[in-house]
């Protein structure tokens, strides 16, 4: 019977649509939606509470108030369904139709729709080719517009004031027509000839760029009107639709008052003004009165649609702006973000979390009361099935009474039914995980300690929410995809997320440390059991060095079987005991060392790769238990004597104070400028602080002990504080330094460093001044945290929005393009090894052995750990890999180009939403870091400035192609190139390290010289930038005039004077003159650049201190001037987050550098006022020139040859320039490197591929250069996949395809310009997006995730992908196939029903 009842349920399958189209409604359409005209402004009768007839809540128009009952009560109940009562005119039906039936208002005068008028750019203005100002004057009855000039010389579309109109009317009489208000605009729109206009615009010969741009916009709009069949005059409303009353409810409050939606107020005003206007028109009232009323009506309609967009917002009784229709859908509390994307969830609860150290990784403790409430429906069903309760009501009673049988059933129901735990803020996918619940007493949820890292949870009062998956499918998904034991790696970098922390680390570290001369040192044991007995009996200490025979199981590479191998190990008792819990296949050497946090992480990683997921999870749990037990036994705690203040501290501080005094004297005697003094003081104190912390760590970390033979030896200290920091359990050297060293330099809130440091530490205590200074830093930390959390959240939101529709849609796109990857080396150190960069990527070409050219990895293999080991042995130093950016899949990405799914460890699965994962991986650490700025307490963590580079390895010196240098008078080699690099090769000629060498550095090595590691390669003055001459001659100054371009600074002690170049802004006159020096040779001529007829000209930049005198002889490599470098600010991610946002928004930097537009020779043309004319001539003689402001630093000189895309003016690069000149590969490299720099500074690891995915989305649109035979317009922006599909079709027909260029959009722009208007509207600028979409008559294909969430379907990713594919298959079937399937299903059902009946019959007998 039950199955029969299900047939009557209203079933609305979501199969019925596969796209959503938006458009503009014609008056006929609005009337067809309507169930009647609303004529009166009344709502309900205040005595009877029944709706007034023809009013805003009229039951006749909108439907009955009670289910199946008319208003007057003549017809009641289901039997009269569909009857229309003749007395009150109400149809007898369900009351829910009041949510869907619309009404309408016939406007007495047309009104323009404010969205098409005021949403910029004004669509009405574009269509009519009039300015917004003019249209507004017409609409609000301040001016006339000529709608039909007749035979007069007047122009159509021309605007005239009232006086003009009167004059013209006297002159021409009725020969022309001019109107005011929306009627005039409507006439113009109606008379618009769209085809003719399109023809005219396409053939417009204009050359002005502005005109072309405007024409393109108009053309696009008119084409859209033509294509979508929307008539422009519909932008002016004649009929206004009325929202169904239940969507703008009127709710009685207690005390006889009513709460109402603002919309009712707005509608009421429209209706009032409309009726009044209608009456005035019937009475033939004077024009001026009617005109005023029409204006008021237009304003009322404006307010209803979008209150406050024009003029003052309409306010209610309480002076608050009323919420209009537009406000209902936009913003955080609008329809999209509040109700469609952010729904609240049933079957959920929340509570405080406490630690559950006894749980297994896949379990959580759920309070009994909570479980009872959450699993109620399951319990009811079970009670009914067992026959304990006959009805749901009885079952409810049973549960409420809490009988023992209920608890038994609860246990049964909960068994193997996973629940989801979520901790807000959910910053990445590990913020929600599934666990199997274990019933516990109490009211707090118990959480497994190892998942805390993923949730970022601690137990200081955090709360978590529980959600119950109801359907079987949901439970299966929870178990397979979301169970905590299936999510052991971070999706952002592939590192394990279940790494122990704090106490556990401390316990494991203590166990695996060795102590010299511990009890039982040197004993030899036969097996671990013996060690255990000896340890229990007290014969041997945990940390004693002993020898043990151990058996380990190693996986054979060929067969993959575990082979036992036994040998005698030198180890400690603790490590031997720990070996018991190692999974088979994990070598003992992995734990035969002091286990710090990093080592433990590595251990779990190795276990995952070698032994698989299941073993690793079990191992992690055992490790946890072991660590807790031993941390308890170790009894490590903190005491005051552990904080050792180094004895050398007073000496170091005294010396620093001495140095600071010297600098102060130099300053008073004028040897150094104020800025230099500040820099040097900060530097001295920075070094002193580091020195103190060095001595302190040396003292803390080592202790002298006596070994077995009575010798004094040094061993690592067992100082508690040192062990906590060293193991990575808690604290860091930076924090210990503040406790036992000196606090050091503090930062002001603006990031600059206070030059008086805090010399005390917390153990000694701070004095009042020091305490006051330190509050500065603390306050900055707190303020930062609050502000940055919001910023970071917004960044994540933009990232998710731009990538949400990127899903793995196919296995292999078959491309052979990719990027060459090599290790990132900076300052001679390998920052990121080649291994880290290519792990889990697919090789684009065969990887060959560098010596014998044999294939190590064929193209298309995913490089895993073992293969990369082979590559490293062979010495491969660059590999071409496929990337997200070179993938050729349309509308998605292929698994091969993406490579390994970092969160699972294998090739990425089809349907994985890699876009969202990338966004989370980049956004999550942003938030994490900003929440952590204040942990260093503002202690300035500035790097001491480098002043030299030294070799890290032995090898041969080589210079890169751009390195240039001259020999100066002292026979030193002085670097005169900006991008010179020293490269060190090993004996095989492989590059080992690469060092950037700044301009003005003195080289300590020559090319092809062999050096040992540690040798100095080059050194320079870190606090100034020099200006150097490359040629010899006599210095001849031009425009170097004291008081005009330079100022004299006299040193009082020595009487020497230096000249400083003044900033043009501070000069009284001569703002455009640039001080320069030329060189004169022996015969009195100007020295020329060899091979050209340009004279050598060297400019002095602003703030330069001139080092030579006029007429002095200079030799090559001599310093002519030096520029002091400004003070350093402290760096923390605060600077970093906006930097990341800036990169992803592809903003042009403020003082951006200039890149060479082509390859050629540099020359300087005639200077203009305040600017230098920089020219580049290519070999064919074409010239490109740029005017550079004089204050900019030009880093090329006359006659230099530059390559296209090389920097010619100093400054940060503009991503748009990089894309245009160097292509998308270089751009991607630039963005990836810059973003990684920011995160690397904070020690955060993110895989490059996530950033590449974002860049792919930033490059997903292109600009049409030449439309060919396509329907595109030149200059139009199109989705890349779409234009590629179009071009394929055109080529197939033998037509000319469209040509296009790459376009780089920032993430906000890219999100808004997506083809899906639903996604764009729910992101930002809702009004503008919807206006545009409506005019274009856009179709949303519902490709992305967001659109599908909004329309309430499964997302086309993951398990939803299969559902969508099946749907497509069903859609492509013809009706006969469909009918056949339906009939087969029906027959099967019938068969089942008969079988059931037969069974029941048999049972009855």
Curated annotation (Swiss-Prot):
Biological process, per Gene Ontology: DNA-templated transcription
Cofactor(s) it depends on: Mg(2+); Zn(2+)
Entry EC number(s): 2.7.7.6
Catalysed reactions listed for this entry: RNA(n) + a ribonucleoside 5'-triphosphate = RNA(n+1) + diphosphate
Molecular-function GO term, any one: magnesium ion binding
Residues that coordinate or bind Zn(2+) 1: 70, 72, 85, 88
Keyword Cytoplasm recorded: no
Residues given in the record as Mg(2+) binding sites: 458, 460, 462
Alphabetically ordered keywords of this record: DNA-directed RNA polymerase, Magnesium, Metal-binding, Nucleotidyltransferase, Transcription, Transferase, Zinc
Enzyme class: transferase
Cofactor binding comment, as recorded: Binds 1 Mg(2+) ion per subunit. Binds 2 Zn(2+) ions per subunit.
Residues the entry annotates as binding Zn(2+) 2: 813, 887, 894, 897
Signal peptide positions on this chain: none
GO cellular component annotations of the record: DNA-directed RNA polymerase complex
Subunit-structure text: The RNAP catalytic core consists of 2 alpha, 1 beta, 1 beta' and 1 omega subunit. When a sigma factor is associated with the core the holoenzyme is formed, which can initiate transcription.
Job description of the protein: DNA-dependent RNA polymerase catalyzes the transcription of DNA into RNA using the four ribonucleoside triphosphates as substrates.
Protein name: DNA-directed RNA polymerase subunit beta'
Originating species: Albidiferax ferrireducens (strain ATCC BAA-621 / DSM 15236 / T118) (Rhodoferax ferrireducens)
């Amino acid at each position: 019977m039950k199955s029969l009842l299900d047939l009557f349920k209203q079933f609305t399958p979501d199969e019925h649509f596969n796209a959503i189209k938006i458009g503009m409604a014609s008056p006929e359409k609005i009337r067809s939606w309507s169930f009647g005209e609303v004529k009166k402004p009344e709502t309900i009768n205040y005595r009877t509470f029944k709706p007034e007839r023809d009013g805003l809540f009229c039951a006749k128009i909108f439907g009955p108030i009670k289910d199946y009952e008319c208003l007057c009560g003549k017809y009641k109940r289901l039997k009269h369904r569909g009857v229309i009562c003749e007395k009150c005119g109400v149809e007898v039906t369900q009351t829910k139709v009041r949510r869907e039936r619309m009404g309408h208002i016939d406007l007495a005068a047309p009104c323009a729709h404010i969205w098409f008028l005021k949403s910029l750019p004004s669509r009405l203005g574009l269509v009519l080719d009039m300015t917004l100002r003019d249209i507004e004057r017409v609409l609000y009855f301040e001016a006339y517009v000529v709608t039909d000039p007749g035979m007069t010389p007047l122009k159509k579309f021309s605007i005239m004031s009232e006086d003009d109109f009167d004059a013209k009317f006297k002159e021409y009489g009725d020969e022309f027509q001019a109107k005011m208000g929306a009627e005039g605009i409507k006439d113009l729109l109606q008379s618009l000839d769209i085809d003719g206009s399109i023809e005219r615009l396409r053939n417009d010969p204009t050359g002005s760029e502005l005109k072309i741009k405007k024409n393109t916009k108009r053309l696009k709009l008119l084409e859209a009107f033509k294509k979508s069949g929307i008539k422009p005059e519909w932008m002016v409303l004649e009929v206004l639709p009325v929202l169904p009353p239940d969507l703008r409810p009127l709710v009685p409050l207690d005390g006889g008052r009513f709460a109402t939606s603002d919309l009712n107020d707005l509608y009421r005003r429209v209706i009032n003004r409309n009726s009044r206007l209608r009456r005035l028109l019937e009475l033939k009232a004077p024009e001026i009165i009617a005109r005023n009323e029409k204006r008021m009506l237009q304003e009322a309609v404006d307010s209803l649609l979008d209150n406050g967009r024009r003029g003052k917002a309409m306010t209610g009784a309480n002076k608050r702006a009323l919420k209009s229709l537009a406000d209902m859908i936009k913003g955080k509390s609008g329809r999209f973000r509040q109700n469609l994307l952010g729904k609240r969830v049933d079957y959920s609860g929340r509570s405080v979390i406490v630690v559950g150290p006894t749980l297994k990784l896949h379990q959580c403790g759920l309070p009994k009361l909570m479980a009872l409430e959450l699993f109620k429906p399951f319990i009811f069903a079970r009670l009914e099935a067992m026959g304990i309760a006959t009805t749901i009501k009885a079952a409810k009673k049973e549960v409420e009474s809490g009988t023992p049988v209920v608890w038994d059933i609860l246990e049964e129901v909960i068994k193997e039914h996973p629940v989801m735990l979520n901790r807000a803020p959910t910053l990445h996918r590990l913020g929600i995980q599934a666990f199997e619940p274990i019933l516990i007493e109490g009211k707090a949820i118990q959480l497994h300690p190892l998942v805390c890292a993923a949730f970022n949870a601690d137990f200081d009062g955090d709360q978590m929410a529980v959600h119950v998956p109801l359907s079987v499918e949901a439970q299966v998904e929870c178990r397979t995809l979301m169970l905590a034991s299936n999510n052991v790696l971070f999706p952002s970098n592939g590192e394990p997320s279940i790494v122990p922390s704090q106490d556990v680390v401390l316990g494991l570290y203590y166990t695996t440390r060795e102590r010299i001369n511990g009890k039982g040192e040197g004993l030899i044991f036969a097996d671990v059991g013996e060690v255990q007995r000896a340890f229990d009996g007290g014969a041997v200490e945990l940390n004693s060095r002993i020898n043990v025979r151990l058996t380990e199981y190693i996986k054979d590479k060929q067969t993959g079987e575990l082979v036992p191998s036994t040998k005698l190990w030198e180890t400690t008792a603790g490590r031997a005991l720990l070996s018991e819990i190692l999974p088979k296949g994990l070598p003992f050497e992995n734990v035969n060392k002091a286990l710090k946090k990093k080592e433990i992480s590595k251990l779990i990683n190795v276990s995952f790769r070698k032994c698989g997921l299941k073993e690793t999870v079990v191992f992690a749990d055992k490790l946890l238990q072991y660590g807790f037990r031993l941390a308890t036994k170790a009894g490590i705690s903190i005491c005051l004597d552990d904080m050792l203040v180094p004895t050398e501290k007073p000496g170091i501080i005294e010396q620093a104070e001495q140095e600071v005094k010297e600098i102060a004297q130099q300053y008073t005697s004028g040897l150094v400028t104020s800025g230099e003094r500040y820099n040097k003081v900060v530097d001295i104190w920075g070094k002193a602080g580091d020195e103190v912390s060095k001595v302190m760590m040396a003292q803390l970390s080592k202790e002298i002990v006596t070994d077995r033979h009575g010798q004094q030896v040094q061993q690592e200290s067992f100082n508690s504080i040192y062990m906590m920091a060293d193991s990575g359990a808690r604290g860091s050297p930076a924090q210990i330094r503040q406790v036992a060293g000196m606090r050091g330099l503090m930062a002001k809130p603006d990031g600059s460093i206070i030059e008086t440091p805090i010399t005390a530490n917390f153990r000694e205590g701070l004095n009042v001044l020091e305490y006051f200074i330190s509050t500065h830093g603390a306050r900055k930390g707190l303020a930062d945290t609050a502000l940055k959390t919001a910023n970071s959240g917004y960044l994540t939101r933009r990232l998710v929005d731009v990538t949400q529709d990127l899903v793995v849609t196919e296995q292999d796109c078959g491309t052979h393009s990719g990027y060459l990857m090599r290790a990132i080396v900076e300052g001679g150190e390998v920052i990121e090894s080649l291994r880290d960069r290519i792990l889990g990527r697919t090789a684009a070409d065969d990887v060959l052995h560098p010596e014998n050219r044999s294939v190590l990895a064929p193209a298309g293999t995913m490089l895993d750990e073992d293969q990369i080991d082979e590559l490293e042995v062979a010495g491969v130093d660059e590999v071409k890999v496929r990337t997200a950016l070179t993938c050729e899949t349309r509308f998605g990405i292929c698994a091969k180009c993406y490579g390994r799914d970092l969160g699972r460890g294998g090739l990425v699965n089809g349907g994985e939403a890699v876009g969202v994962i990338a966004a989370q991986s980049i956004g999550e650490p942003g938030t994490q870091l900003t929440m952590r700025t204040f942990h260093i307490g503002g202690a300035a963590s500035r790097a001491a400035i480098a002043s030299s580079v030294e070799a890290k390895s032995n090898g041969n010196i080589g210079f890169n192609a751009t390195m240039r240098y001259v020999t100066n008078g002292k026979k030193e080699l002085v670097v005169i190139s900006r991008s010179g690099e020293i490269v060190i090769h090993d004996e095989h000629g492989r590059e080992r390290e690469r060092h950037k060498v700044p301009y003005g550095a003195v080289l300590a090595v020559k090319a092809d010289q062999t050096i040992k590691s540690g040798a100095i390669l080059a050194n320079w003055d870190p606090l100034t930038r020099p200006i150097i001459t490359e040629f010899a001659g006599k210095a001849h100054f031009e425009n170097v005039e004291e008081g005009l371009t330079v100022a004299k600074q006299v040193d009082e002690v020595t009487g020497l004077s230096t000249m400083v170049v003044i900033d043009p802004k501070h000069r009284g006159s001569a703002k455009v003159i640039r001080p320069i020096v030329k060189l004169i040779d022996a015969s009195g001529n100007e020295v020329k650049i060899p091979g050209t007829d340009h004279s050598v000209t060297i400019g002095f930049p602003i703030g330069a201190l001139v080092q030579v005198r006029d007429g002095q002889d200079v030799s090559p490599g001599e310093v002519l001037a030096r520029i002091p470098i400004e003070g350093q600010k402290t760096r923390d991610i605060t600077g970093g987050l906006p930097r990341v946002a800036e990169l992803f928004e592809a903003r042009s930097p403020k003082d951006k550098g200039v890149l060479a537009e082509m390859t050629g020779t540099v020359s300087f043309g005639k200077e203009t006022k305040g600017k230098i004319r920089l020219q580049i001539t290519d070999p064919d003689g074409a010239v490109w020139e740029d005017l550079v402001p004089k204050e900019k630093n030009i880093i090329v000189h006359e006659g230099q040859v530059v390559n296209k895309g090389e920097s010619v003016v100093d400054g940060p690069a503009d991503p748009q320039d990089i894309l245009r000149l160097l292509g998308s590969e270089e751009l991607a490299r630039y963005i990836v490197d810059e973003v990684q720099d920011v995160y690397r500074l904070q020690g955060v690891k993110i895989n490059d591929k996530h950033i590449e995915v974002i860049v792919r989305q930033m490059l997903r649109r292109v600009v049409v250069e030449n439309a060919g035979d396509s329907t595109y317009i030149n200059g139009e922006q199109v989705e890349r996949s779409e234009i590629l599909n179009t071009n394929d079709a055109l080529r197939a027909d033998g037509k000319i395809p469209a040509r296009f260029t790459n376009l780089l959009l920032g993430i906000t722009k890219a999100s808004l310009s997506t083809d899906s208007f639903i996604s764009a509207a729910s992101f930002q600028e809702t009004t503008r997006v919807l206006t545009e979409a409506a005019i274009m008559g856009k179709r949303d294909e519902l490709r992305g995730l967001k659109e599908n969430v909004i329309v309430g379907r499964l997302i086309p990713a993951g398990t939803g992908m299969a559902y969508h594919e099946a749907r497509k298959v069903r859609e492509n079937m013809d009706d006969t196939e469909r009918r056949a399937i339906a009939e087969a299903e029906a027959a099967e059902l019938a068969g089942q029903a008969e079988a059931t009946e037969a069974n029941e019959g048999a049972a009855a007998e």
